[in-house]
Amino acid sequence: MIRFFPLLTVLLISCSPLKKYPLKSERWENDIKALEYIDNEEMCGQDCILFVGSSSIRLWENIKSDMSPYEVVARGYGGAHFYDLIHYTERLVKNHNPKAIAVFVA
């Protein structure tokens, strides 16, 4: 859990504490469930880079060849924003033990 603290800190700092974010994170629930199902089939090794975030990650068709020789696992969904990612971070990351996590949201 200590490994997730820096990621969560960055995510929380990136979000304005004064702004009211809409509670629309549930709209990605089906996408997240599909990614959890994929996690049962494709695990991230200790030296992999886990890419999480919006559809830019999901639609990056050549991510494995573009990031070669690194092992990568892409977990992109919908049109994610930081407040969505905060909501789903544990579910997207908990089954992996990556060397690094790359985050991209619009």
Protein language model regions, located:
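Oxyanion-hole/transition-state-stabilizing segment in secreted/luminal serine hydrolases
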Residues: I57-E71, Y83-A106
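N-terminal secretory targeting modules
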Residues: M1-L50, E61-S68
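Small-side-chain structural scaffolding
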Residues: S14, G76-G78, A100
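Phenylalanine-focused residue identity feature
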Residues: F4-F5, F51, F82-Y83, F104
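Conserved beta-strand elements of the Class I
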Residues: L50-V52, V73
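Acidic/histidine-rich helix-loop elements
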Residues: P22, V72-F82
